[in-house]
Regions:
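Macrodomain-like recognition of ADP-ribose-binding/processing modules
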Residues: 1-133
Length: 133
């Protein structure tokens, strides 16, 4: 219902939402897709985009109406576990996924946002990101 109301039924790659779930130990679920439909996302920055979206939601986000929460997400979420983003159907090698998640953590949590002086530098950084180097 939340995705229909907030995103016309489709949560794009690079966006994240949080909803309450009924589980004795896990109170919240964050949806941060790595692909629009089941397909290969190897050679893309999709794991980075999904991880960054989830981390930004926890750090800066607010609960949406109908999510089961209210106020700042950071007041409710104290830890975050992520699966191997894109490593199943998406075919992203686990090492590449881990490297992309690391860059997302560096940017969002540690504040090491990469600024590029020109397009060439941005393309080189993107190439390193998708290769996991």
């Amino acid at each position: 219902a939340l995705l229909r109301a907030q995103h016309d039924g489709e949560l794009p790659v690079g966006r994240a939402e949080i909803i309450a779930i009924e589980h004795p130990r896990i109170r919240w679920l964050i949806a941060a897709p790595t692909m629009r439909v089941p397909m290969s996302v190897a050679g893309t920055a999709h794991p980075f985009l999904a991880a960054r979206a989830a981390l930004r939601l926890v750090k800066q986000g607010h609960f949406a109406p109908g999510s089961g929460g209210e106020g700042h997400v950071s007041h409710a979420v104290t830890s975050l576990a992520m699966p191997g983003l894109g490593t199943g159907t998406g075919g992203v090698p686990p090492r590449v996924c881990a490297a992309q998640v690391r860059v997302a953590i560096e940017e969002v949590i540690l504040g090491r946002v990469h600024r590029f002086p020109d397009l060439r530098a941005a393309l080189a950084a993107h190439d390193c990101l998708v290769r996991g180097t």
